[in-house]
Amino acid sequence: MKNLSPLHAESRVSWLAHTASACLIDEARLSPKPGLVDSRGNGAHQDLNLALMERSARSLQPTFHALAEQSWRRPADIALRETVGRLGREGEAQMMLATGGVNTHRGAIWALGLLVSAVAMLGGEGQSQAIADAAAALARLPDGFAPKSFSKGLRASRRWQVPGAREEAQCGFPHITRLALPQLQHSRARGASEPQAQLDALMAIMTSLSDTCVLSRAGMAGLQAMQQGACEVLAAGGCASFAGRAALARLDAIMLALNASPGGAADLLAATLFLDRVAG
């Protein structure tokens, strides 16, 4: 998208922000997701529900707008990295206000925030791999103003010595570009409905993601159960098939029994939906 007028650039910025927020809502509503909040209920959560997730997603639209606006046609450098970090932390504070202190989308702010910024850096358009590469370049830069605190995800990543959300972004979101997007397109091509194709994309992520949300609650055995169950869904034909849906129901029961929710995979699914909609 070359030499957009200021009016058209602002229109694109607004569209990116709306799309990012809409993808969070679409991910939350998608059903049936194993262990996750969806249109059926709260999954393995006591403090989350669909209305709260939707309120959180809408509260983040101004943050996504600011990220796109501040990143428009800028190179990946320390100044932009620190701006993106500051806006992300401000967005997290707004999320907490909207939810009464419940962490609904901290991981999604990181993943989607980087991808929104990356699209804007490229002038509002780009192929999915180019967008992911731009996000990775930004994620690899240090943010000198980031607080020296440890999230649950970071603690789990270090305890179990597995890559977390930071490494996923710094590597260019391989679970999106190599697994989720190809699976989404493959399932659509085979005649799956859009919700079924999106569930298959979630399964593709879950087959190999070291989801620190699951690790925090259920340890390595729980993570392996999640990965194996997701593999079985896809091996059975995916969610468009009766056998695949039966395997998905079994995986849902396993996650609920473990009291574990693959929140990291859900964040990456929302980011997958965003890339699918904005990439040229």
Swiss-Prot record:
<dbReference type="Pfam" id="PF01874">
    <property type="entry name" value="CitG"/>
</dbReference>
<keyword id="KW-0067">ATP-binding</keyword>
<protein>
    <recommendedName>
        <fullName>2-(5''-triphosphoribosyl)-3'-dephosphocoenzyme-A synthase</fullName>
        <ecNumber>2.4.2.52</ecNumber>
    </recommendedName>
</protein>
<comment type="function">
    <text>Involved in the formation of 2-(5''-phosphoribosyl)-3'-dephosphocoenzyme-A, the prosthetic group of the acyl-carrier protein of the malonate decarboxylase.</text>
</comment>
<comment type="similarity">
    <text>Belongs to the CitG/MdcB family.</text>
</comment>
<dbReference type="GO" id="GO:0046917">
    <property type="term" value="F:triphosphoribosyl-dephospho-CoA synthase activity"/>
</dbReference>
<dbReference type="InterPro" id="IPR002736">
    <property type="entry name" value="CitG"/>
</dbReference>
<dbReference type="GO" id="GO:0051191">
    <property type="term" value="P:prosthetic group biosynthetic process"/>
</dbReference>
<dbReference type="GO" id="GO:0005524">
    <property type="term" value="F:ATP binding"/>
</dbReference>
<keyword id="KW-0808">Transferase</keyword>
<keyword id="KW-0547">Nucleotide-binding</keyword>
<dbReference type="InterPro" id="IPR017555">
    <property type="entry name" value="TriPribosyl-deP-CoA_syn"/>
</dbReference>
